[in-house]
Swiss-Prot record:
Protein name as catalogued: Adenylate kinase
Recorded name of the encoding gene: adk
Domain notes: Consists of three domains, a large central CORE domain and two small peripheral domains, NMPbind and LID, which undergo movements during catalysis. The LID domain closes over the site of phosphoryl transfer upon ATP binding. Assembling and dissambling the active center during each catalytic cycle provides an effective means to prevent ATP hydrolysis.
EC number: 2.7.4.3
UniProt key word Amino-acid biosynthesis: no
GO CC, alphabetical: cytoplasm
Subunit structure as annotated in this protein's UniProt entry: Monomer.
Major site of localization recorded for this protein: cytoplasm
Amino-acid positions noted as binding ATP in the UniProt annotation, renumbered to this chain: 10-15, 127, 211
Family of this protein: Belongs to the adenylate kinase family.
A Gene Ontology biological process term: AMP salvage
Amino acid sequence: MNIIFFGPNGSGKGTQGSILKDKYKIAHIESGAIFRDNIKGGTDLGMKAKAYIDKGDLVPDEITIPMILDRLKQDDCAKGWLLDGFPRNKVQAEKLDASLKKEKMKLDIIIEMLLDRQIAKDRIMGRRLCENDNNHPNNIFIDAIKPNGDKCRVCGGALSSRADDQDETAIDKRHSIYYNDVDGTLAAAYYFRDLAKKDDSIKYITLEGKNALPDVTKELVSKL
């Protein structure tokens, strides 16, 4: 089961990806982690990517896509993989599709999390971190994980928020890229949607991201 997962920051995409990883024993691959692992490991591609990152430049697709393909060939991907965070635009979608076909790597499922942009923004700004345990999710805008006042709903620990979660300009910039359906990330998703219309072996799934986490998971599993 090979999956590409699309969804804006704040949609719960990462959480659902982790659930699929555990349920189906597939690798959950985040594009950012690929860069970090290659740079930390000192690979040729990692060092090339680092040179661009250090200058504040975007890493070219000619470096990024081979890194992704190398990751998809690792042993933990034998039962399948879920790619999260790439492609981010239509051009990357086209290049990734061509590269997967060249490597004879089958793409089975595309998942798109649907979520209103303002709700996504509110969810990001509503995140709170438990100072006792980062694995205790708290969010002032999500009833299921709403804090107890200013304390962690799980352990009663003190809460704080990340600076970048409160940076409206940065959030708006990321969402402008994602919600761009002409050449941004949604355009990448729609490229694969159109591909699925012509290829019955590829399934395109949409999920209502505004629903409660268990309901989203139930909907997702029922559609796979």
